[in-house]
């Protein structure tokens, strides 16, 4: 789907970024700009800046920002099209969406919307059946006995599917919906012998399952009579994909951002009870393991995740497996260990809301501390396990991003191995495996475990540490940003592959795409051409970098010559690569680059 560019431009021109951001951030004027606490991460010192002149915002802490569309996308976790539509409504500009591909693609989008509409429409009748009918009385009593108040039932949209094979079927048919589409949406099942349709959910308490935008895309039907299965969920559909959905994310997102932490539970019933008790940053998967898509969503909100699974053997095993994976993905992982045999719902039922929130606040351990406490008996009595887990825990602690949290974990873990914190710290340093060499892709590289590493963002502070060649690349790009004629005059003069700084290389390509559609460079428009926070950071930093007046004669040509230097690499470049090889621990590469530097120095003598 595509929105006409003229509409996008009109909405952008009518939306003042200062007014928009002020709805979410308390801003104070500092010079020509405005500054406030970043809405995307927790901070005590303001680092979020808004430029009224350039109509952009930027956080120097988490690197997020952009123009009005990108700010709206990030703050509401929505797509670009949704952001344009929302801002269009804000400034009374009608958004005309046209198809850019085939009519079938438009039909797919239309079908998805109808599936959501069916789910939301039937929810009203499920709620009515639970709260207003005789048939729903037993299910309602069941909920009330388990602490569900009328207000909570209404807030969560909980309902009841009557014990009828055609309640949902007949209702949707009367409303004019395609029954085959209702089947594809997961609301109906089908008899494969005669292809007749019937209700998937019968005689069950119905819990709506929502996507990140708060739209109902599926259901979980819970039995209250002992029938199996205990929970019957919607099947995988175009709008309901378990690997992409986290229960309660729509409600918890704001608290997750504010607290800079997400708490992962095992089931949605635990989430509802925990949220009611006052723990607002809680989510759960839909009965599946945490997927890479889930982790991607979580990364957008916070780098801190706390696991609070059931206090049984299965919960412990799941905590160890999930925590290990999250740690290797670069997240700070913590664990809340519930008493044996209890889940959050049971803990709240036994001890109450206040005791639960106090417990959660005071009983949070690092993943390394939790892991060693689980394995302590084996460590104490099995020398082979002692050595194995010492290496494992050393590695786990080395993966932690915060040096403060690392030291805390060292202090907590060391006693389990009967060593001092200093000895454990030395062991961590000793056992850090040298990284294997993984070639960098266009945006970054890979660590020794094959994990993706994003490139270092080029912020203003880092501009002071650029090599001679990178400084030439920076100045060259800055001149190209001045006007389209300069860009056209010099675009063919350099080979993009000669850029040593990968961020600058892609800015060069962005400028090509930008000037193909625009005559005058504007940072607020240019940031729409990038999807990466790192590249957006580079564009904004280049915008803030000032050249000294007009270029002197042949100045730009001099930059071109530096960028296009042929032959062997400069010593400066080789030194840079040697430092990188040292950083990743590749001994062979270190030897190679050192030999090149020695040879280069001999040539100079």
UniProtKB/Swiss-Prot annotation:
Mg(2+) 1 binds at residues 266, 310. SUPFAM superfamilies: DNA primase core, N-terminal domain of DnaB helicase, Zinc beta-ribbon. GO terms for molecular function: ATP binding; DNA binding; DNA helicase activity; DNA-directed RNA polymerase activity; zinc ion binding. Mg(2+) 2 binds at residues 310, 312. Its EC number is 2.7.7.101. Binds 1 zinc ion per monomer. Residues 260-341 form the Toprim domain. It catalyses: ssDNA + n NTP = ssDNA/pppN(pN)n-1 hybrid + (n-1) diphosphate. A zinc finger (CHC2-type) spans 38-62. GO terms for cellular component: cytoplasm; DNA-directed RNA polymerase complex; primosome complex. Its cofactor is Zn(2+); Mg(2+). Keywords: DNA replication, DNA-binding, DNA-directed RNA polymerase, Magnesium, Metal-binding, Nucleotidyltransferase, Primosome, Transcription, Transferase, Zinc, Zinc-finger. One of its GO terms (biological process) is DNA replication, synthesis of primer. InterPro entries: DNA_heli_DnaB-like_N_sf, DNA_helicase_DnaB-like_N, DNA_helicase_N/primase_C, DNA_primase_core_N_sf, DNA_primase_DnaG, DNA_primase_Znf_CHC2, DnaG_bac, DnaG_cat_HB. The keyword Kinase does not apply. Contains an N-terminal zinc-binding domain, a central core domain that contains the primase activity, and a C-terminal DnaB-binding domain. Monomer. Interacts with DnaB. RNA polymerase that catalyzes the synthesis of short RNA molecules used as primers for DNA polymerase during DNA replication. Belongs to the DnaG primase family. This is DNA primase. It comes from Staphylococcus aureus. The gene is dnaG.
């Amino acid at each position: 789907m595509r929105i006409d560019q003229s509409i996008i431009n009109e909405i952008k021109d009518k939306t003042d970024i200062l007014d928009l951001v002020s709805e979410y951030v308390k801003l104070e004027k500092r010079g020509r700009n405005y500054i406030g606490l970043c809405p995307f991460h927790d901070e005590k010192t303001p680092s979020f800046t808004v430029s009224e002149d350039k109509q952009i915002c930027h956080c120097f802490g988490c690197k997020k920002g952009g123009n009005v569309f990108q700010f709206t996308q990030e703050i509401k976790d929505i797509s670009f099209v949704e952001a344009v539509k929302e801002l269009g409504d804000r400034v009374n500009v009608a958004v005309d969406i046209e198809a850019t591909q085939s009519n079938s693609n438009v039909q797919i989008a239309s079908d998805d919307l109808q599936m959501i509409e069916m789910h939301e429409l039937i929810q009203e009748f499920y709620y009515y059946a639970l709260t207003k009918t005789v048939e729903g009385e037993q299910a309602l009593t069941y909920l009330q006995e388990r602490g569900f108040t009328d207000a909570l039932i209404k807030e969560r949209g909980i309902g009841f599917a009557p014990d009828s094979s055609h309640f949902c079927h007949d209702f949707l048919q009367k409303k004019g919906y395609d029954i085959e589409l209702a089947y594809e949406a997961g609301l109906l099942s089908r008899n494969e012998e005669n292809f007749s349709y019937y209700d998937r959910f019968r005689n069950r308490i119905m819990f709506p399952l929502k996507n990140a935008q708060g739209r109902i895309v599926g259901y979980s039907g819970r039995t209250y009579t002992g029938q199996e299965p205990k929970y019957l969920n919607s099947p995988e559909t175009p709008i309901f994909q378990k690997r992409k959905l986290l229960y309660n994310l729509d409600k918890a997102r704001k608290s997750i951002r504010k607290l800079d932490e997400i708490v992962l539970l095992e089931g949605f019933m635990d989430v509802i009870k925990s949220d009611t008790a006052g723990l607002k940053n809680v989510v759960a998967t839909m009965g599946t393991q945490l997927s890479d898509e889930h982790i991607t969503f979580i990364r957008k909100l916070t780098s801190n995740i706390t696991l609070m699974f059931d206090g049984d053997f299965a919960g412990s095993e799941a905590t160890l497996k999930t925590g290990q994976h999250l740690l290797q993905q670069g997240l700070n992982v913590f664990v809340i260990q519930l008493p044996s045999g209890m889940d959050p719902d049971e803990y709240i039922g036994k001890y109450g809301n206040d005791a639960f929130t106090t417990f959660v606040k005071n009983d949070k351990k690092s993943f390394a501390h939790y892991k060693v406490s689980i394995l302590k008996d084996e460590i104490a009595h099995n020398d082979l396990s002692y050595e194995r887990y010492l290496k494992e825990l050393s590695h786990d602690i080395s993966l932690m991003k915060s040096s403060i949290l690392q030291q805390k974990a060292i202090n907590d873990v060391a006693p389990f191995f009967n060593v001092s914190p200093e000895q454990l710290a030395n062991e961590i340093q000793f056992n850090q495996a040298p990284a294997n060499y993984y070639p960098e892709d266009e945006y970054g590289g890979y660590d020794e475990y094959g994990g993706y590493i994003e490139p270092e963002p080029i912020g203003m502070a880092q501009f002071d540490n650029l090599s001679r060649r990178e400084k030439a690349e920076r100045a060259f790009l800055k001149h190209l940003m001045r006007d389209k004629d300069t860009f056209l005059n010099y675009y063919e003069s350099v080979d993009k592959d000669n850029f040593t700084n990968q961020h600058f290389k892609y800015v060069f390509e962005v400028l090509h795409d930008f000037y193909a559609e625009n005559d005058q460079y504007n940072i607020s428009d240019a940031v729409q051409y990038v999807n990466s926070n790192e590249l957006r950071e580079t564009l904004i930093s280049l915008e803030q970098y000032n050249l000294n007046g007009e270029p002197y004669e042949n100045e730009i040509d001099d930059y071109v010559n530096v960028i296009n230097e042929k032959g062997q690499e400069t010593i400066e470049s080789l030194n840079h690569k040697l430092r990188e090889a040292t950083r990743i621990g590749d001994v062979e590469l270190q030897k190679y680059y050192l030999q090149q530097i020695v040879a280069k120095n001999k040539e100079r003598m």
